């Protein structure tokens, strides 16, 4: 959203933590270009990093999907890393590996491996932890023309970032596709 909220974009009851009642706020703004962006960013990545709630939401949608849906097949095939302090097993969604304890060091080790990008989706607490530890290189943000007035946000208070705009593209629905890289001191 314009005020940085990323909580429960996909459904009314997706994440009601903190008495959040605005779930499902992205549906009115869907445009096929959003799907194209998701597919493009996924194809440039060889791993998906998610917090537990986002992993459970996505897994509940994609794991039972029959083969043949191009995006569903891509989501099920990509290696997934779920960060959680409460899960003991990640077998509910195929190709998933559980990360618990010392998340920063484990993500740093993942980033050091050869390969393409590691994509994160949702997972505000995880985003905050990784940003505070300088482990995010790029942000692909969809900015929706709505102010929700509260909820979990993409950027944590007290964590300043300098970003460089790579791309901004408005869609007919009013959503703006943005791509930023993190500027680091030389």
Question: What annotation goes with each model-predicted range?
Answer:
Residues 1-186:
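Enzymes that bind and transform nitrogen-containing heteroaromatic metabolites
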